[in-house]
Structures are given as structure tokens and as C-alpha cells.
Regions:
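ATP-dependent adenylation/nucleotidyltransferase module used to activate substrates
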Residues: 1-155, 182, 257, 364
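AMP-forming adenylation/ATP pyrophosphatase catalytic core
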Residues: 128-134, 140-366
Length: 366
């Protein structure tokens, strides 16, 4: 009796090659497509670039992949659950002036919880996804492709959820995955990577968010001088470190968002990428998920996806909180994830609650 593996088939090349590799290894492979977003049900009218529902296009591609591989494809809808567990969190955080990462919560509540339960109903011994990550024993390791490593997004997935999980492409680079897809004539071999919000797709961000949150105009303040230099159109449209599309088209100097105050609806900017107002040296991290029993004092941290690792000193607090100290971290942003590594191993991850400089709360980050 072959071991049955249910693969999350998204309609993209990574999940397609994952299914291919598992089939080559002799597993009984079954595809399962999740539809987690419905533009009609969710009143999603603004921001769709081509007028075509991307979720149905993805399902078409998923079906073509499974037909090519001669494996069955099932479909499940988690539209309500995604809205309640992931998207409402996303909107709530935006309203607080923070910068959330919905992909992290999607993994926690949908891909490695509801999906796994649905796979078990299909008789799965294991599940697999197209994440660039590796599991060795009970350790979560970075994917071999440093540019594509997705352990950052897996940082809120529990050790229990990671049991019976396979990451078939974690040992490959993206070019190697593309090469395999072309070699075996997979219909999505040349499909471009998705870069939008998890399961929603690529959108004009501000237009998309305007479906659900109405931005309130407010002042843009030069943090150095305290002078008003412009007007913003809703704090949810900006993130710390942002340079483009701030709304100061007549200003020839390079300006960066360095702070947001949701109480006064104020956006703060600083000039120059090396501005001291973009720097911090300490952060309080909440809702920490411990993926390992290792609790080192010295490690490295990633404060946003694809950012460079930063050496940190860690203090372990009560209530699943940690305090991390570092040297001149740039654009460390409340609401984003802080993920801790020891070499290749992902140890833990939590949400940045508060940021400090020289032992003081940063006043323009409220």
C-alpha cells in the first residue's frame, strides 16, 4: 500500500513540481485546490487589473496540471474561514496603523490547519505544499534557495501542524523548479510567480483596500522640522520605509515614511535612506510561536521577508513575548513578523508590537 500524500495544488509552478516529484518517488498523490476568496461574495470590485477572477484562472491551471500528471484533483472552499481568520485580521491591523502580513496567518489558519484536516478526510498520510523550506526530523530549515526561502511565512505554524508535512522542492532553487516543469511539459512551466496578497492575487493595493476601508486624509509631517509638507489619503496605504507613492511629487529630495500615528492620523517622513529616524535598536515581539525547544540568547532575526538577517540578543519574557536588541535596524515595522534563526534553523516567530531607540519608545511610531 503506497503512502497517500495530498498536495496543495494552487495552479502555480511550485505546487505542480511538488506533485511531480512526489509521484516520481512512488507516493499515491492526490491534488487539493483551495478557493479562499470570492470577489463577488467579498464585494471585491476595485483593484482587479484585468477584470478576470484570478481564483478561477488558478483552478483552471490546477486542473490542467493534475490532468497532465494523471492524478485526481479535489476542490474545497474556505471563503468564510479565510475572511474570518485571515482577512479580518489584516483589516483590523491596518486600521490600527500597523503593517500586517496576511500570508503568515493564512499558513497558520488555512494551509496547515483547515487544509490539513480536509486532506485527512481524503485519507492522507501526509500533506505537501510548494513552499521553499525543509524539514529534518522536527527542525524547520530554510529552503536551499535563499532568494525564495519561505520559512519567514511559516513562523506562526506550530510544531504539531508541521507533523506529517512534506516540502518537496525545499532542496531546489527556483530555476531548477522551472527547468523540471519544462522538462516534464507541465502547463504552468512559464506561469509567473504570484506576488499579491495570499489567495487574493495581484491588485492595485490602494484600490483593493478601498473596498473595505475608507482612508481619511491627514497631515504628512517632516519629522525633523515638525512642518507639514503634504496630505496623505489614509494611513493604511503606507508602510515604514516606503519611498514611492507617498504623495510628495513636487519634492525633489528622497523621502521615506518613518512613522505613523493612528491617534492623530499623522504620517511622518524623513529625508535620506540613512536617516536616523528610520533606525531602531530594540523591539518587543508578541504572540511568539516556538518551533524549536532551543532558546538561545544570541541568534539572528529577519524583520521582513527577504530582508537581511540581523544579529540579535534575545530576552525571554512572559506571555509568549520576547525582547530583541540589535544595532541600527532599519524600518523595523510594528505588525510585521520578527523571525528568529540559528544558522539554517527557524526557531520561532512573533509579531512586532513596539519599537525602541536608545531605551525609549519611538514617539512617531504609535
Amino acid at each position: 500500500m503506497f503512502m497517500k500524500v495530498v498536495v496543495g495544488i494552487s495552479g502555480g509552478v511550485d505546487s505542480a513540481v511538488s506533485a511531480l516529484l512526489l509521484k516520481q518517488e512512488g507516493y499515491d498523490v492526490v491534488g487539493l485546490f483551495m478557493k479562499n476568496w470570492d470577489s463577488n461574495i467579498n464585494n471585491d470590485k476595485e483593484g482587479i487589473t484585468d477584470g478576470v477572477c484570478p481564483q478561477e484562472l488558478d483552478y483552471r491551471d490546477a486542473k490542467a496540471v493534475c490532468d497532465e500528471l494523471c492524478i485526481p484533483l479535489y476542490r474545497v472552499d474556505f471563503i468564510k474561514e479565510y475572511w474570518n481568520d485571515v482577512f479580518k485580521y489584516f483589516l483590523d491591523e491596518l486600521e490600527k496603523g500597523r503593517t500586517p502580513n496576511p500570508d503568515i496567518m493564512c499558513n497558520k489558519y488555512i494551509k496547515f490547519d483547515l487544509f490539513k484536516k480536509e486532506a485527512k478526510k481524503l485519507g492522507a498520510d501526509k500533506i505537501a505544499t510548494g513552499h521553499y523550506a525543509r524539514i529534518k526530523g522536527n527542525r524547520l530549515l530554510r529552503g536551499v534557495d535563499n532568494n525564495k526561502d519561505q520559512t519567514y511565512f511559516l513562523s506562526q505554524v506550530s510544531t504539531e501542524q508541521l507533523k506529517d508535512v512534506l516540502f518537496p522542492i525545499g532542496h531546489l532553487t527556483k530555476p531548477e523548479v522551472r527547468k523540471l516543469a519544462k522538462e516534464y511539459n507541465l502547463p504552468v512551466a512559464d506561469k509567473k510567480d504570484s506576488t499579491g496578497i495570499c489567495f487574493i492575487g495581484e491588485r492595485h493595493y490602494q484600490q483593493f483596500v478601498s473596498n473595505y476601508l475608507k482612508g481619511k486624509d491627514g497631515d504628512i509631517i517632516d519629522v525633523e522640522t515638525g512642518k507639514k509638507v503634504g496630505t496623505h489619503h489614509g494611513l493604511m496605504n503606507y508602510t515604514i520605509g516606503q519611498r514611492r507613492n507617498v504623495g510628495l511629487s513636487g519634492d525633489q529630495k528622497r523621502h521615506y515614511v518613518c512613522g505613523k500615528d493612528s491617534k492623530t492620523n499623522t504620517l511622518y517622513i524623513a529625508y535620506g535612506s540613512d536617516s536616523k529616524y528610520l533606525l531602531s535598536d530594540e523591539a518587543l515581539i508578541e504572540n511568539v510561536n516556538f518551533i524549536s525547544d532551543k532558546h538561545p540568547t544570541f541568534a539572528t532575526a529577519k524583520f521582513r521577508y527577504r530582508s537581511e538577517d540581523v544579529p540579535v540578543t534575545i530576552e525571554y519574557l512572559e506571555n509568549n513575548q520576547i525582547r530583541v536588541k540589535y544595532v541600527d535596524g532599519k524600518a523595523v515595522t510594528p505588525g510585521q513578523a520578527c523571525v528568529i534563526y540559528l544558522g539554517e534553523q527557524c526557531l520561532m516567530g512573533g509579531i512586532i508590537k513596539q519599537v525602541f531607540k536608545d531605551g525609549k519608545d519611538i514617539w512617531y511610531l504609535k
